Amino acid sequence: MGKKMKKIGIIGAMDVEINIFCEEMKKNGTLKKTECGNLVFNEGKLCGKDVVVVKSGIGKVNAALCAQRLILQFEAEKIINTGIAGSIQQNLHIHDMVVSTDAVYHDMDATAFGYGPTEIPQMHTSAFDADEKMIEAAEKAFALSESAKKYKLIRGRIATGDQFVSYSEQKSHIEEICSPACVEMEGAGIAHACFLNKIPFVILRCISDNADDSYEVTYSFNEKIASEECAAVVLKMLEFLD
């Protein structure tokens, strides 16, 4: 019997973040859809790898539950979270990308009980570390991408919360408590599920807005193109994963 291929899970919160993968699997004739509850899991091959691509929906709980099902039911052995984010660091601009060093919940606050900012009670952690080999694969893929000709990729912390960060005071507070590179609404939920299941993960995000009062102009204009730029790097990244 041949050796069973490892499956790679790819999660995006919105259709626009995963469409490129489904279209590629449709083109190569490997796409198989499986409905589980309100989730649709798209199985197939990309870059010679067995993948399962799924839209989680927006928010931490949706993302964590999606990751858990991907691990248990579809036997994903690695998970990539792809999508868009708002910049927190001043040196990050629209269309730049962030590959996660770790992920935190910026809205986790049990400091009244002596825990540190973002620290999860009774878990002895405030951040979930991404897999180094997957980080390196993302960096290699970005270096070969069209995006690298105009934009940059940095390593950094991803901050997650059930809030769309859209004003400067909110942004400053998040920067103060956990010093992330960018902010979004799913990554730490996925990272949390991977941590509990001992599954390697990485989050790759393309900057769509500045997480401030300018979001009405920047986000709507950049949502689609930033999502597709990120997905293109993830697609290339698969070539560098075992």
PLM segments and residue spans:
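N-terminal short beta-loop-beta anion/metal-coordinating cradle
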Residues: G2-Q68, F74
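Generic non-transmembrane alpha-helical segments
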Residues: E24, K133-A148, A193, A232-F240
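Alpha-helix C-terminal capping segments
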Residues: R69-Q73, N91-L92, A191-P200
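Structural motif
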Residues: E77-I80
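Mid-sequence, gly/pro-rich, charge-dense loop/helix-turn segments that line enzyme active sites
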Residues: I88-C178
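A C-terminal functional module that forms or caps the active site or interfaces directly
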Residues: Q163-E216
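His/Asp/Glu-rich mid-to-C-terminal helical/loop segments that flank catalytic regions of hydrolases
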Residues: A211-D242
